[in-house]
């Protein structure tokens, strides 16, 4: 359970996302990514080497969509760190906003409580985290917030 001042710090963090238009930027990136994926799918779903290169002999719209869905992750795997970096950048920006307009110390307290409540590790593997975690590790966020701290 967060104290009222910790809840205020979390709310200030979320308002930081709003202030910096993180949600709008994420939606635009998602839409552009989807349009690019549909464009590539449109190029590939009648292209015989796409099917043969993945061991499929039957060409159809359904098979093209299924095959594209199955293999696209292999080709986009290397872009994952770019998107996690952008997401983490947004989190640090929202943390700075919360530290400025609320309390860095209270946000630190709320982060610790939320990580414990969610059974998350405060020190995840850095390589795995760089690829798959949209939020920076709590330990790094806490160190950054301590530099911005109230005390």
Label every PLM stretch briefly.
Residues 69-81:
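Hydrophobic alpha-helical transmembrane segments of polytopic membrane proteins
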Residues 57-70:
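Hydrophobic alpha-helical transmembrane segments
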Residues 1-59, 78-151:
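Polar-ligand-bearing catalytic/cofactor-coordination segments
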